[in-house]
Amino acid sequence: MAPNLRKSHPLLKMVNNSLIDLPTPPNISAWWNFGSLLGICLATQILTGLLLAMHYTADTTLAFSSVAHTCRNVQYGWLIRNLHANGASFFFICIYLHIGRGLYYGSYLYKETWNTGILLLLTLMATAFVGYVLPWGQMSFWGATVITNLFSAIPYIGQTIVEWAWGGFSVDNPTLTRFFALHFLLPFMIAGLTLIHLTFLHESGSNNPLGIVSNCDKIPFHPYFSLKDILGFMLMLLPLTTLALFSPNLLGDPENFTPANPLVTPPHIKPEWYFLFAYAILRSIPNKLGGVLALAASVLILFLSPLLHKSKQRTMAFRPLSQLLFWILVANLLILTWVGSQPVEHPFIIIGQLASLTYFTILLILLPLTGALENKMLNY
């Protein structure tokens, strides 16, 4: 009998083992769809980004008008740009839900997979930041100025690092050209990290909602989960196209319709919605270095999740107290996101400070304590 090409060919064998014959827990819920959705987001962003890069000019005098030209004169240029800009939002929605799933179901106990995942998040954040600067509108320019300036809080070498990153003494043409280069490079780095992420995941196999070993009861990925993933794609691409076609500027900042002007500061400098929670944490500390450290800690704290897991059960499925804390954390992040979009004045300052304190308290203190308490209550 002729050998099955799918199982013998060196390249097809890899595809087969990760997408076709992959043994998968039969009970993984829709929360396990976000990994493949992130893959689709990445593919869409690289494709639309490539098409945009063909019409973009990375020069301070031409960047703004080249983007306008793309939207006005290029065939479907407006659609490509709207899909790319809103695709970024969906990328972040998916990655935040994916991380939330990981925290809820204890997926972080696959340490290598979890750590590469955090590296993916950091790379995605860097990509989105440099990408936001490219249209060279007011918020692009001032966002770049404010965020790069944070590095000057590093003692002794900070100012040198900032001027090195800028390629001069302010955000200018060299900054824009290198940001374009980085924005082109980083998505491919994300793609590479994704392969590493999947390699580590396939070492252990997927976790499942019960958090128990499922080796005795697995089903092939195709057709069951390939079909389920396609349903997920449909359910994500529908709101994405709806947003891109009906209200493409809903999530953007109106300031960015004004070309960058170093002499006029916008009244409220704020990042895109997906960075607002971290921005609120940054602003909640009235000291520059302290704020920068808190900002870094707000994301890097995820590296500690595997070390802070004190429960004998893996998931939160049967741990009501931990569940309560988890959903308080989610609500807290939504409050931080809202506060980040508000001006720095009376009620918002104290709300932001309390929400920031709560964020770190839940992750560092309350969740581990609750895990230990639940062990005791269940006589483990």
UniProtKB/Swiss-Prot annotation:
Cofactor: heme b
Annotated protein name in UniProt: Cytochrome b
CDD domains documented for this protein: cytochrome_b_C, Cytochrome_b_N
Membrane topology label: Multi-pass membrane protein
Cellular component terms (Gene Ontology): mitochondrial inner membrane; respiratory chain complex III
Annotated cofactor note: Binds 2 heme b groups non-covalently.
Lineage: Eukaryota, Metazoa, Chordata, Craniata, Vertebrata
Subcellular location, record wording: Mitochondrion inner membrane
Positions that bind heme b b562: H84, H183
Residues spanning the membrane: 34-54, 78-99, 114-134, 179-199, 227-247, 289-309, 321-341, 348-368
Pfam families on file: Cytochrom_B_C, Cytochrome_B
Chief place of localization: mitochondrion
GO BP annotations, alphabetical order: mitochondrial electron transport, ubiquinol to cytochrome c
Keywords of the record: Electron transport, Heme, Iron, Membrane, Metal-binding, Mitochondrion, Mitochondrion inner membrane, Respiratory chain, Transmembrane, Transmembrane helix, Transport, Ubiquinone
Summary of the function given for this chain in its UniProt record: Component of the ubiquinol-cytochrome c reductase complex (complex III or cytochrome b-c1 complex) that is part of the mitochondrial respiratory chain. The b-c1 complex mediates electron transfer from ubiquinol to cytochrome c. Contributes to the generation of a proton gradient across the mitochondrial membrane that is then used for ATP synthesis.
PANTHER family: CYTOCHROME B
Subunit architecture: The cytochrome bc1 complex contains 11 subunits: 3 respiratory subunits (MT-CYB, CYC1 and UQCRFS1), 2 core proteins (UQCRC1 and UQCRC2) and 6 low-molecular weight proteins (UQCRH/QCR6, UQCRB/QCR7, UQCRQ/QCR8, UQCR10/QCR9, UQCR11/QCR10 and a cleavage product of UQCRFS1). This cytochrome bc1 complex then forms a dimer.
Family to which the UniProt record says this protein belongs: Belongs to the cytochrome b family.
GO molecular function ontology, one term from the record: ubiquinol-cytochrome-c reductase activity
